[in-house]
Amino acid sequence: MAEVVDERVYTVPLRDAKKAPLKKRAPRAVKALRQFIERHMKAEEVRIGNDVNEKIWERGIKKPPSKIRVRAVKYADGTVEVRLAE
């Protein structure tokens, strides 16, 4: 694994996904999370962990959470890994 450059904990708002049609809400929430992390961590590549994806999809495609708390770890090669904050 590459050297860790930065590690932050964010509460990411996913409320804008609720404006999407019912059958597109969870995918829209994943995109919103990816865009938020790219913007705030200045990342070239964002890898979303399985645990985060499962948390977003937990209640199905129609009802993603309004916000999610995640831990973002940036490595020296510019990639960011996103996991659930505990």
UniProtKB/Swiss-Prot annotation:
One of the GO BP terms on file: cytoplasmic translation
One Pfam entry name: Ribosomal_L31e
InterPro entries recorded: Ribosomal_eL31 (IPR000054), Ribosomal_eL31_CS (IPR020052), Ribosomal_eL31_dom_sf (IPR023621)
GO CC annotation: cytosolic large ribosomal subunit
Similarity annotation: Belongs to the eukaryotic ribosomal protein eL31 family.
Annotated PANTHER family: 60S RIBOSOMAL PROTEIN L31
Protein name according to UniProt: Large ribosomal subunit protein eL31
Naturally occurring in which organism (per UniProt): Methanopyrus kandleri (strain AV19 / DSM 6324 / JCM 9639 / NBRC 100938)
